[in-house]
Amino acid sequence: MIRNSIKSISDYPKPGILFRDVTSLMEDPEAYRATMQVLIERYSNTGITKVIGTEARGFLFGAPLALELGVGFVPVRKPGKLPREVISESYELEYGKDILEIHVDAIVEGDKVLLVDDLLATGGTIEATTKLARRLGGVVEDAAFVINLPDIGGAERLKGIGLNVFSICDFDGH
């Protein structure tokens, strides 16, 4: 049910790309609930103290997961979107660089942090997010995704920085 609710859009956002649209999953309340239940069952009673969601679709899965786990939710955002003092981390995109930010007081030394995003492709966003959380003293060992595109290699990249990678659905291609 979860996999079948994710629509594939050809040539979006550019020719040659087959885009996996997780918003179609969220339009189906049974599929969305089933997705959240998989994450809740996997991460209940694991000692997680904070869930970080990356802008923007990571919020849609990370925040309800944190609520169900009874832990804090921490948004990681693009520059200028967070009101309190932040630290930043730049990372490489396919064509250029981007920056992510986190509040300096969102993670405390020893927090066991779970990273959540909708889709894993190159792993650059989650690698930068891992660096931010670790700089603040967080213990980051796990990253969870609704969708993984294994042909792109992000899971291997994240395993290389010490993360356990979990995804609900793997899709071939780019």
Curated annotation (Swiss-Prot):
Record-linked CDD domains: PRTases_typeI
* Organism domain of life: Bacteria
* Record's GO cellular component terms: cytosol
Q: Give the keywords, sorted.
A: Cytoplasm, Glycosyltransferase, Purine salvage, Transferase
Name the InterPro entries for this protein. Ade_phspho_trans, Adenine_PRTase, PRibTrfase_dom, PRTase-like
Recorded family membership: Belongs to the purine/pyrimidine phosphoribosyltransferase family.
| Record text on subunit structure and interactions | Homodimer.
Q: What does this protein do?
A: Catalyzes a salvage reaction resulting in the formation of AMP, that is energically less costly than de novo synthesis.
Q: What is this protein identified as? A: Adenine phosphoribosyltransferase
